[in-house]
From Swiss-Prot:
UniProt record similarity statement: Belongs to the bacterial ribosomal protein bL33 family.
Lineage of the species this protein comes from: Bacteria, Pseudomonadati, Pseudomonadota, Betaproteobacteria, Burkholderiales
Name of the molecule in the record: Large ribosomal subunit protein bL33
Keywords: Ribonucleoprotein, Ribosomal protein
Annotated source species: Paraburkholderia xenovorans (strain LB400)
Gene3D superfamilies linked to this entry: Ribosomal protein L33
Alphabetical list of SUPFAM superfamilies matching this protein: Zn-binding ribosomal proteins
Biological process according to GO: translation
Gene behind this protein: rpmG
PANTHER family: 54S RIBOSOMAL PROTEIN L39, MITOCHONDRIAL, LARGE RIBOSOMAL SUBUNIT PROTEIN BL33M
One Gene Ontology term of the molecular function aspect: structural constituent of ribosome
Pfam families: Ribosomal_L33 (PF00471)
Length: 55
């Protein structure tokens, strides 16, 4: 069976709270690391989330 183009990734908060989201991304169309602003419920603000690998 062929391997898909999408990888599971973890978006971790840069606020240092330890909060994270999981999502998928197409590694062929977007090889660079993602940096997205999302809501962090621990600090109750929108902060940047950086892409990290799922362990």
């Amino acid at each position: 069976m062929a391997k898909g183009a999408r990888d599971k990734i973890k978006l971790e908060s840069t606020a240092g709270t330890g909060h994270f989201y999981t999502t998928t991304k197409n590694k062929r169309n977007m090889p660079e690391k993602m940096l997205i602003k999302k809501f962090d419920p621990v600090v109750r603000k929108h902060v940047e989330y950086k892409e990290t690998k799922i362990k």
